[in-house]
Design a protein with these regions (language model features):
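Alpha-helical recognition/docking segments in bacterial nutrient-uptake
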Residues: 1-8, 55, 67-174, 178, ...
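N-terminal helix-turn-helix DNA-binding module of bacterial transcription factors
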Residues: 1-67, 348-353
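Short beta-strand segments enriched in small/hydrophobic residues
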Residues: 23, 62-77, 124, 175, ...
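Hinge/beta->alpha junction and helix N-cap segments in small-molecule ligand-binding domains
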Residues: 74-87, 106-113, 161-171, 187-240, ...
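Periplasmic-binding protein-like
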Residues: 123-128, 185-188, 227, 248-258, ...
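Short acidic capping loops at alpha-helix termini that bridge into adjacent secondary structure
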Residues: 182-183, 222-226, 276-281
């Protein structure tokens, strides 16, 4: 019978290197407590013996889990369905892996986000789409965990990463106005129970302000019935556009607060025999891969989603390591990307659908 090779222990390394077990521990966890040449020699001996420090032991020694929590108000099944979060999480993962950190997604546990937060063992948190006044955010602050808010309303004392939502929305509306459109519908992001959707400074509110600012400047009123909410998915966008069109509204332009909603509107328009952009123009927001492969390719507002995820993690690590204060606030630029889903407003003869 083949006998399994015994795993090297900290005592084996200490004996081979001629040092104490404490010195071996310092070499991996507190190298500043040893002379550089001693720490290097111990690590070389450990590598030769195939010794690896136990991760739990390292956590206890360092007081760190080397894990970052990603706090989201929606269930993971919803998060992973949304292409925006795919791009954002890719950026988060890139920055975390580069610094040797793991990720822990914190989403509602048995319907309770507070319970999930309470059970999370992490060094710091990136909170997405939650305002500073939400109970879970306050819970993290009280616990003293470093935190970066993303796409959220932050207090002056809190670190935050966001994009210029209002400016981007204004660009979208101005683009359609320049093409002669005068009849608009806005397909807004529907808030979850815990998101910042009802926050007057949350992402949906900022984007709506941007749309309204451009329309107001052009003398165009956007009535209450001209704003419908939708889950940020393709089916959600399709249902929202179908509702407005089937109710008798006849917009020539759709301002959608996400690319997924916009692509849903394209689908519903096609099902109703509308040509895009001949009869209807559609602008999204995000510029995810879905926008580029849509038919027709989607005009949208680009935001650096992956980079936003990277910067959120980089800022959190800087706070953890004392290289940045906890109150840094960064706003990333947005820009218009014109593709095939927008065109001149149809003339009066064609506005008879």
């Amino acid at each position: 019978m083949v006998q399994m090779m015994r795993r090297a222990t900290i005592a084996d390394v200490a004996g081979a290197a001629g040092v104490s077990k404490t010195a071996v521990s310092f070499a991996f966890n507190r190298p500043d407590r040893l002379a550089p040449e001693t720490a290097s020699r111990i690590r070389t001996v450990a590598e030769t013996l195939g010794y690896r420090p136990h991760p739990v032991a390292r956590m206890l020694t360092q007081g760190r889990t080397r894990t970052i929590g990603i706090l989201t108000p929606q269930a993971l099944s919803v998060i992973f369905e949304n292409p925006y979060f795919g791009a954002f999480n890719a950026g988060v993962a890139t920055a975390a892996e580069a610094s040797g950190y793991a990720l822990h997604f914190i989403s509602p546990l048995h319907g309770s986000l507070a319970r999930a937060v309470n059970r999370a063992t992490v060094d710091g948190v990136v909170a997405v789409g939650l305002s500073a006044h939400h109970a879970e955010v306050e819970q993290i602050s009280v616990a003293g965990l470093p935190m970066v808010l993303v796409d959220s309303t932050a207090l002056p004392s809190q670190a935050a990463i966001e994009v210029d939502d209002e400016g981007g929305a204004r660009l979208a509306a101005e683009h359609l106005l320049s093409l002669g459109h005068r009849r608009f519908v806005v397909l807004a992001i529907e808030p979850s129970d815990r998101s910042d959707g009802d926050d007057p400074d949350g992402v949906p509110a900022r984007r709506l302000r941007g749309y309204r600012a451009a329309l107001d400047a052009a003398g165009i009123d956007l009535p209450r019935e001209g704003v419908l909410t939708s889950v940020s998915t393709i089916p959600g966008g399709a249902a929202a556009f179908a509702e407005t069109w089937d109710a008798g509204q006849r917009p020539t332009a759709v301002l959608a607060m996400s690319d997924a909603i916009a692509v849903g509107a394209l689908r519903a328009a096609r099902e109703r025999g509308l040509a895009v952009p001949g009869d209807l123009s559609v602008v999204g927001f995000d510029d995810v891969e879905l926008a580029r492969i849509a038919d027709p390719a989607l005009t949208t507002i680009h935001q650096p989603i992956a980079r936003k995820g990277e910067q959120a993690v980089e800022l959190l690590l800087a706070i953890l390591e004392g290289r940045s204060g906890p109150d840094q606030h960064e706003v990333l630029a947005t820009r218009l990307v014109v593709r095939a889903s927008t065109g001149p407003a149809p003339d009066a003869a064609r506005r008879t659908h």
